[in-house]
Every structure is written in C-alpha cells, then in structure tokens.
A protein has these predicted regions:
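N-terminal signal-anchor module of multipass membrane proteins
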Residues: 2-60
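Membrane-interface helix termini and inter-helical loops of multi-pass transporters
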Residues: 27, 64-74, 178-190
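Interfacial segments of multi-pass membrane proteins
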Residues: 30-37, 108-120
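Membrane-helix interface "capping/anchor" motifs
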Residues: 92-104
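Single conserved hydrophobic/aromatic residue that forms the stacking wall/gate
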Residues: 219-230
Length: 230
C-alpha cells in the first residue's frame, strides 16, 4: 500500500472524528441536552444516524459520487501527505480540550489556495453576521412571549415533534456543508466501497459522541443556556 493512501485514510478518520465531535455537537447539542433525560442515547443516535445516512447517500448519488455536494470544486484532489493529516490532528487536540474552533479553516487551509481561503473568509463573515442578526431578532420576539422563569408542566406533543423535525433539518443542512471538511481527504468520486467505509466510520464516531454525552463541547453549550426549553 502506498504511503499516500495511509495518510489519506488517517487524515479522513482524524477529520471525521474531529469535525463530528466538534461541529455536530454545536449543531445537535441542544437537541441532545433537551432529550437525554427522556430518551436513551442510542435512540437519539439512531435518529441522527438515519439523517446522516440520507444526507451522505443522497450527495453520493446526486453528485456522481461526490459526498461534498460539489463544494470542493475549487480544491482539486491531491495526493495526501503527512502535513495534510496534521491539520485534523491539531483539530482533534483542540476538540478534546473542549475548545470550539473553525474546522473549515483549520482543515481546508492545508489544501486550499490563498484566493479560495479569502472567499471562504468573506462568506463566513457574512453568514455569521446574518445568522447573528436573525437569531437576535427571533430571540427578542420569543422572549416577549415565553417566560422561562415560569414552570411549564404541560408537555405538548407538537413541540416535541417540531423540535425533532427542525433538529433533523439543521443536521441535514450541516452535513451538506461540513462534509467537505471530511471529504477533502478522499477522491472526489467515491466508489461504493469507500462510501460504505465513510458511512460506517461516521456512524460509529457519532455513536461514540452520543454515548459519551457529547463530551466537553456539550458542556460549554449547556452551561450558559437553558437547552431544556428548546
């Protein structure tokens, strides 16, 4: 086996664990916190894994084997070297320390040109700005309607279903975007064998994250908020 193939799979596995452990909790953290006392971890894992399978398989089918949804068209595949695999290794250390970081810049910077990184930076700043403004406006509206200091003993099935549906859609949208951070180590057109490897690996990693309760990243999410109201 060529050494570049070893670095390719090592980089993929490190990126898969780092990205899922870091970013997925930022996406599914409130979902996990709000439901962990009502459902066993494997039920939540099954729900998240089902959406993961749908998202990755759809991307693979619709984009001719490209699970990144063609988000890596500006970053052509190149032979993976040790320094490429170093980036997700550093991300893994930061994740284990409970430090939320930008996986996109840390992982893709090892592959992308300065021009591509500049465009990514502009899009990220604009995206974060719009998200922050919209979130703040929504919060202003909601906080005038719901009094979080008041007990709410009545649980309505509608809210539970709405939470699961919205969390599933958010998870699906996140996978469409951030799978590029994992798929950058792999050929742009995957065969069926590599697709199965990707699915099994990511499902097992996601299961470990759910089994451990989300790790340190979930603690940082839960501390300043009241996720049980979500």
């Amino acid at each position: 086996m060529e050494l570049s193939i070893v670095w390719m799979y090592l980089g993929f596995f490190l990126a898969a664990y780092s990205v899922i452990a870091n970013d997925s909790i930022q996406t599914l953290g409130t979902f996990l916190s709000a439901n962990k006392n009502d459902f066993p971890w494997y039920t939540l894992w099954f729900a998240a894994s089902l959406m993961l399978i749908i998202s990755i398989t759809y991307g693979w089918y619709a984009y001719d084997g490209d699970i990144s949804y063609e988000r890596l068209t500006r970053i052509p595949y190149q032979e993976v070297q040790w320094y490429h695999a170093l980036a997700p290794g550093i991300l893994l250390l930061l994740t284990r320390s409970g430090i939320p970081v930008s996986t996109t810049f840390l992982v893709l910077s090892a592959f992308a040109s300065v021009t591509v990184l500049e465009k990514m930076l502009v899009k990220s700043i604009v995206g974060y700005g719009i998200a922050a403004i919209v979130a703040y406006l929504v919060w202003i509206i909601i906080e005038r309607i719901i009094n979080e200091k008041q007990d709410h003993p009545t649980h309505r099935k509608f809210w539970r279903v709405s939470q699961w549906v919205s969390s599933g859609w958010l998870w699906f949208a996140w996978l469409q975007h951030d799978m590029a951070n994992i798929a950058v180590f792999l050929p742009r057109q995957l065969d069926l064998t590599n697709l199965i490897i990707v699915l099994i690996s990511t499902i097992l990693i996601l299961g470990y994250v759910f089994y451990t309760g989300g790790g340190l990243s979930l603690i940082h999410i839960s501390e300043p908020t009241r996720p049980y109201w979500i």
